Structure formats: C-alpha cells, structure tokens
C-alpha cells in the first residue's frame, strides 16, 4: 500500500513572506514537519509541493522530495489544500493513502503520525484536533454597530460544565484515502 505525505509550502504568503522557511527555534519551520514525517516510518515518500525554488532547496536539504514545481494555477490565495494534495498524488503516479501535513506545524511529532496511520486501519480519515478551552456554545457575535449577541441563545443560562466539549482542527495534518483527495471530498 503506497502512502505519501504531502507538505504544501507556497512561497507567496501575503502576511509573512516565505513563512515556510522562516527560522523557528533555529531552523526553518517547515523542517519540523518534514522530520516528523520522515522519522515516523509511515510514508513511502515525503513530498513538498511548492512554487518557490528557495523552499524547494530547503525541503530537499531536509530530506523531502520535490518531484515537481507546483503549477501557477494552484498557487493563488484562494486555492485550498485538497486540490494541491490531489495534484501531488497525480504527479507521483498515484497513492493509496495520503497525509496532508502543514508546513507550519512545528509541534507535530512522528508519534502523532504513527497513531494516525494506525487509526486508518479502522477509519477513513485521521485528523489532528484540539479541544476549545472555553465552551463554544457561549460564543458571541458582533454586528456592524459593535453590539454583541449570543450565537446560541438557548445556552445563555446553561452551566459551562453541562455543555458538550467542542473541538477544532489543530492544523497539523489530515490523513486519509488518496481517492478522497482526488475526488475533492470534504475532509
């Protein structure tokens, strides 16, 4: 079963130029993701998808492969990660499983990826998640005049310990069947 890791690392970030190779604790931030993927032993190939030669060179120096330069059609601010992963899968001749790993996830570990690979034995996807510290059911919204109101009015008087836990994408990775990425299914 061919399993690949795909690390999208576009060079054209508007907020932080070349953020994927900015130093973080002494090395380019992207290298933490590459090292975790390589050290996990889970992947047949760890691929960085980029449009930037400096990022490609840093990825290669870190042990990842850069078998292609991402086409301009997949490099603007409005392209999501699923088409980028699908392109990588196709560019390397297919895969059975693919793991999208964010380049800006310095706290990802090889153990996280091993556990996710194990979870795929029983599930279609494995996703890194984190719990919200405060109950989201107490969330507020603000209108254009600056007035706030409850999003879930039915929970205004509910004790916080009686509210269900809620989770969010921790932005480390999403691991699943390659076919789901190719079919552009929601992850």
Where are these regions (language model features)?
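A short, N-terminal amphipathic alpha-helix
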Residues: 29-44, 57-61
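Conserved core of the sugar-phosphate nucleotidyltransferase
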Residues: 80-83, 87, 106-187
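Short beta-strand/turn micro-motifs composed of small residues
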Residues: 9, 50-51, 102, 129
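Conserved SAM-binding loop
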Residues: 6, 22-23, 48, 100
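Short active-site oxyanion
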Residues: 42-47, 124
